[in-house]
Amino acid sequence: MKEVMSVNETVREALAIALLKLMKSQEFAKIAVSDIVRVAGVGRSSFYRNFDSKEDLICSYITELYRERFESREIPVRLYGSGNIEEFLTPRFNFIKEHEDIFKTLHRQNMLYNFFIMIENDIVPILCGHN
């Protein structure tokens, strides 16, 4: 069960949800920080206290979801020597499926690259046989 979020965590999540909502109807490049904070119902200073850019916001949000998913459970963070590749990859594909709406939005915005860069250090060594 997730612990109670701090006010700052709540603000960060509200900003991310607002950005994702806007991304469903607008091009990412045309979304202004003022649009995000308006939809999130927070002040502009809240955005800049937490993030350097819109890209930072979306990447931070997905990173946090990813960390929550994989640090809170007994899921292999890395696959070493005797590990099973299915045990490693299946939870990651399930993560994408569980957050399908986010990933579809990222895909429509041509931003999936950001997610794959984030998990690159996990998956590339496995795919190259260097576990």
State the predicted function of each range.
Residues I31-A32, K104-L106, F115:
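Short, hydrophobic secondary-structure boundary micro-motifs
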Residues M1-N8:
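N-terminal intrinsically disordered/low-complexity leader segments
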